[in-house]
Amino acid sequence: NNVKIKSVKLADSVKEIGNQSFYNCTALRDINLENVSQIRWESFLGCVHLKEITLSSGIRYLGRRSFSGCKRLNCVKFEKSTMLKGIEAGVFQNCESIEKISLPKGLTEIGNKAFYKCTSLKDIELPEGIQVIGNEAFYQTAIQGIKLPSTLVEIGNSAFLKCRSLEFIQIPASVKKIGRWSFHGCGQLKKVEFLGEPEEIGEWIINKSTVIRCKKGSGIDAYCKEKEFQIEYIDEEYT
């Protein structure tokens, strides 16, 4: 809660940032994190003047809500490959200025509300290896298009709810579960294409204005007919 600290230079020996270490340090603009391997929960929550962070290949843990509410944070740099296995719940929640982010190889999970209300986020690259996208992970972001990895197994409830700029999404054959309202409220979403056959599909995953492309006679086909969604069948040559 220190409102005067503007810049912090960490010694190379500092490997961990503890819980709420810089919580609501509203004047903080600059801190070096290149040698840090663990950032605990709410470490930088509410640091509204923090604009840029660089995380090294040695980063192995980002605690829940660690950068939540950093409203001016517009540049998050990851190495292409890190030791990080998951983005915990709410890590970048309400970071309203992030426009683009490329997540590192090695990730298997994006937690609940990880990018919740990152309202400027238009472009995100998801690496192969991700298996789970959590509940409300990309709720009300500005994503226009996103390539889901072929390793993805689960899309959580409301994962892309109210992504009003999203126009098209292709669901990989690997996906087994899609939560309720996952793509609901996406007013510009023209089509959702299913390459496989999920075992579980939640309620009202799309608006009725969206077309679902799927295989004729599939479980998705039956789901769409039950919900009276628009259907377009994938051509035999495509399959």
Language-model segments: what does each one mean?
Residues N2-E16, T26-Q38, V48-Y61, K71-G86, ...:
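Structural signature of tandem-repeat unit edges
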